[in-house]
């Protein structure tokens, strides 16, 4: 048996600053892991949920998927309609399930019946929906609001999904953060680390920057400044 001891003296409370980055990105912290590579943790996360049957299809959910994708021609149309249905209809509700909670996602039968759960239940429902629609989809772990360090430790606080596109690339999806929103991945999660639980294993990934054209709020200002220094005008927001 090996025993590791870490100690530090005279530690003062961390002084926060206005608009600073997340505390986990600035304050001292200790990370430990018995996993040598991210790929190993990715495979483990995949196997834990596949062995449990987290995404096993059920007839009533299959009928809903068929209804939703009817008439949808492209893969993005199908992915979008499934993501938004799950986001809008599986309510976020954090209820303790006792011991055994963690990296195993609850199965579709439970989630579709209860229509509520935490992020892993919402993501798990979407993964099952995508698979019933013919897509290859898997769970992924992320740390919402702060970075994930390079050491492959368990420093995640949020569960999302990835779907494989026809191009062969994986696209991250977050149904928890996009209810009644046009996005498929919240722009608040740009350049955020995530780890897909895929059978071939994956290194730590980084979400892309959301293009400006995805955020088309335009402000037109028509103002006049008179000789007395008074500014009058109007703003039009579209």
Task: Annotate the PLM regions.
Residues 62-63, 98-109, 143-145:
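Short, conserved phosphate-binding/catalytic loop or strand-edge motifs used
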Residues 1, 72, 115-118, 137:
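A conserved hydrophobic secondary-structure block that centers on an alpha-helix together
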Residues 77-81, 87, 93, 99, ...:
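Active-site-proximal cofactor/substrate-binding loop regions of enzyme domains
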Residues 199-238:
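Long hydrophobic segments that form regular secondary structure
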Residues 58, 75, 79, 112, ...:
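Active-site-proximal structural scaffolding
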Residues 69, 93-99, 144-149, 156, ...:
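Active-site-adjacent structural elements in folded domains
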Residues 1-100, 227, 231-238:
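Secretory-pathway-linked proteins and extracytosolic
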Residues 120-210:
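Hydrophobic/aromatic-rich core segments of domains that either
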């Amino acid at each position: 048996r090996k025993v590791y001891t870490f100690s530090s003296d005279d530690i003062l409370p961390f002084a926060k600053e206005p608009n600073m980055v997340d505390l986990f990105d600035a304050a001292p912290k200790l990370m430990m892991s018995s996993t040598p590579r991210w790929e190993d943790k990715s495979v483990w996360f995949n196997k834990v949920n596949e062995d449990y049957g987290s995404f096993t299809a059920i007839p009533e959910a299959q009928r809903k998927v068929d209804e939703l994708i009817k008439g949808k021609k492209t893969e993005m149309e199908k992915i979008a309609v499934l993501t938004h249905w799950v986001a809008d209809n599986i309510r976020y509700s954090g209820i303790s399930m006792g011991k055994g909670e963690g990296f195993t996602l609850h199965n579709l039968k439970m989630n579709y019946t209860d229509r509520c759960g935490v992020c892993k239940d919402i993501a798990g429902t979407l993964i099952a929906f995508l698979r019933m629609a013919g897509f290859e989809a898997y769970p992924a772990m992320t740390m919402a609001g702060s970075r994930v360090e390079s050491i492959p430790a368990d420093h995640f606080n949020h569960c999302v999904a990835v779907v494989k596109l026809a191009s062969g690339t994986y696209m991250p999806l977050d149904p928890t953060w996009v209810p009644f929103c046009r996005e498929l991945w919240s722009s608040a999660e740009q350049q955020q680390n995530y780890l897909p639980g895929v059978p071939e294993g994956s290194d730590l990934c980084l979400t892309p920057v959301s293009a400006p054209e995805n955020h088309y709020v335009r402000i037109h200002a028509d103002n006049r400044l008179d000789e007395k220094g008074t500014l009058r005008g109007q703003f039009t927001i579209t």
